[in-house]
Amino acid sequence: MASTQHTPTELEAAGDLVLPAADELAGRFPLTPNAHPATPEEYGEIMSTLAFGKKFTDHMAHMRWTREGGWSDRGVIPYGPLELTPGASVFHYCQSVFEGIKAYKREDGSVWTFRPGYNAARLNHSARRLALPELSREDFVASLVDYVRADVKWVPDVDGSSLYLRPFMFASEEFVGVHPAGVVDYYVIGSPSGPYFKGGLSGVAIWVEREYHRAGPGGTGSAKAGGNYAASLLPQIQAEAKGFSQVCFLDTYEGKYLEELGGMNMFVVMADGVIRTPELTGVILEGGTRNAILRMLRDEGVDVREEKIALSEVVDGIRSGSVAEVFACGTAAVVTPITRLAGDDFDVEIAVGDKTREIHKRLTDIQWGRAEDPYGWTYRLA
């Protein structure tokens, strides 16, 4: 039966709230120009290579929170090293959360982003879980607006490339002792970036991890916390040594149900047209790209199911043909076909499918302004 009823999640509802226009928010983070910006030669080299997340722009947005005074010291300042003592609590207790969002340059030279309200809501969700302070969505979006306007020349105009934005906050108070920090810093940095996976829609090979888990029930799995990603690095290294691009993690209880990749959500396209994705259990990240895909599919009348998906179902389905496509999604890679799925006792391959291509095209066309945005997801920054 096709999905007809859908109750928005808390993040989805918060992300759909109408934001003030960028011009109304501009100026909240006053600019202190960088006296030593990248030279023309350095700038040219960076913009001609566009490696993902390797180089950064001339400035960064910043504000600070204290228990006594709340958020203050807003500004766009020169990019450079941070002053932290070895006693800064983030080094000891991992109070740190982040977001990932992109700025796209359209053909007319304008710069847009995708669902910043959703990212603002998710940052606050993550902050609550790690006992960090929340910030207003206006401050969050204003930090993007003022930062991008200061460094707008760093937004690539190459198709498929973008200025990858990394808002993050961390506990910077100096102490050793297990309690929430009374001083927290928030920053936005940006990296001119090409595609996350160089192969594009050619597909990636995924190793299914049985020994290690990304997160567990009651933990921080639904938060975009740095520690979750640190926990994925060892199995990622081991998978890469076997020739795989990413790791798929299974549930901690039974070790049989798909959860997510190290940094992306998963979808399974059945041959009968049903599209499935692992349900939100508080363990996996509620991805903005995942949510957008679900909404588009539901509006098309597709039978979309958020449910437990056993690994054995997928492997057997690929072998029998009842599973037609498998793909992953996230801000960095958008939509990526999974063309090989392997583990200790199985190894199956599957072709890139038409539905994956269609979803990728529809989503990126909205993001880049090549198609109508019926949801109001795109937001002009500059």
Specify the residue positions occupied by each region the protein language model found.
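Intrinsically disordered, low-complexity linker/loop segments enriched in Gly/Pro
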Residues: 150, 170-172
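Extended, Lys/Arg-enriched charged tracts that mediate electrostatic binding to polyanionic substrates
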Residues: 56-59, 156-170
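Charged, gly/pro-rich active-site loop segments
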Residues: 137-139, 147-160
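Helix-start/capping segments and mature chain N-termini
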Residues: 2-143, 147, 175-382
